[in-house]
A protein has these predicted regions:
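Short hydrophobic alpha-helical membrane-anchoring segments
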Residues: 12, 16, 20, 57-58, ...
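Membrane-interface helix/loop boundary segments of multi-pass membrane proteins
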Residues: 1-13, 24-28, 53-61
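Residue-level signature of the transmembrane alpha-helical core
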Residues: 5-12, 38, 42, 46, ...
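Hydrophobic/aromatic residues in alpha-helical transmembrane segments
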Residues: 48-52, 107-110
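Membrane-interface interhelical connector segments
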Residues: 19-33
Length: 124
């Protein structure tokens, strides 16, 4: 858990310069900008990092999480390509897959899978 949490936070922080300078991910004029976006992005990265790590551990093939990461990026960009909302103020919350509301199921799955793994390790 500690490695996944640290990895997700570092991965999120890695994006911060572009988020602060050019509005990468959520734009520049959104609810709670820029602090809320930085925090939400770390939550998204923790959840995705955990799921990608589990994919790698179970398959022992780097291509599986790499393809899943690419698929997530493509899905995350799709609403931006297909829909141009008149008001981007709430982008940090949703409906984009990188919004907090959309990331909550991914976060729940990541936490549940991690807790399940921790229980299995305790039994062994």
């Amino acid at each position: 858990l500690n490695g996944r949490l640290l990895g997700g936070v570092v991965w999120g922080i890695w994006h911060w310069p572009l988020m602060l300078l050019v509005g990468y991910e959520y734009g520049t004029n959104y609810l709670g900008a820029p602090l809320l976006g930085l925090v939400v992005w770390c939550v998204v990265c923790f959840a995705l990092n955990t799921l990608l790590d589990i994919l790698y551990e179970r398959t022992e093939c780097i291509w599986v999480p790499a393809i899943a990461h690419g698929a997530f990026n493509a899905i995350a960009a799709l609403p931006q390509v297909l829909v141009t909302p008149a008001d981007t103020y709430y982008n940090v919350l949703g409906p984009m897959p990188i919004g907090l509301i959309s990331a909550l199921p991914m976060l729940a799955a990541a936490v549940w899978l991690t807790l399940r793994e921790m229980k299995q390790e305790e039994k062994n």
